[in-house]
Amino acid sequence: MFTSSQTRAPWAPTSIILLVVYLGGTAPLLALGGGTPLRLVALAARIGAVFLLLRLASRRRQGIDGYVERILVDWAPLILVPALYGELPLLMEGLAGTVRYHDPAIARLEYSIFGSQPAFQWAGRWPSRALSELLHACYASYYALIYVPPLLLYLGMTAPGPRLGRGTDAFQDTVLAVQVSFLVCFLAFVFFPVQGPRYFGVPQGVPDGPVRRLVLALLEAGSSRGAAFPSSHVAVATTQFVMVVRYQPRLGLLVFLISLGLAAGAVYGGFHYAVDALAGVAVGTLAVPLAGALRRRLEPSGPDFTSPPGPA
């Protein structure tokens, strides 16, 4: 057992260590898929990101980083989420060559649990345009759920108690838990790709509306095929709810209702199987204690790596 004087401080925040490990560990999958220009660009960008993160972490540790550098280190795990999500098909192909999707297995599991296929039936059972638009709006709120709760903590606007802002554990813990939730989902997508019901037709009777059309446009522009199980939408929403209850309790009911609508909308809109949503709840819930265990392991001395409030 180490005393505080014997404990070695980590070289970077846990979130940065985890990000570097993920980038380095999955890099071979980009190389294994062949030497196409897109893969080479993605691999070069990944190598560059690792070196940049290591450089920023080194400057942070030496206390010579600037204000913008601190912000980059604080937010890098969430800033890189869209890029990491977008490259998932390349990782899937690097692992298996021709990607084999596991939708038949998930559909069988779905039927064994529910005795039906909710993703194809819920909209026809409750064909309300108002309900449809509400659930699709909740589904679209996923993007705000990723960034708004951490931002409020970062600005010191919502955390209870006297210690607010970037110097608190609340921001670090929230970012790390969300990051763990994402990375668990991403690894599941790579090793067990599932397309989701959206690729097998529109749910019968689903009402049309501007919000649904917006969601469809977002998915068409930015979704990665094979990234359905578990639902990262539901996983991240669940993680954010748990962290909001812990650190921003005034937002708890709002985030709970949005998350509930998001999970229902994922199935109602035909974007996910119901078991995708259930698996997302499980991942999102387990991500919180897993993130805590990682931080205790990698930051045993409990240093404060996030930026102090105010300019450098």
Where would I find each of the regions flagged by the language model?
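Transmembrane alpha-helix/helix-exit interface in multi-pass inner-membrane proteins
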Residues: 87-104, 108, 181-206
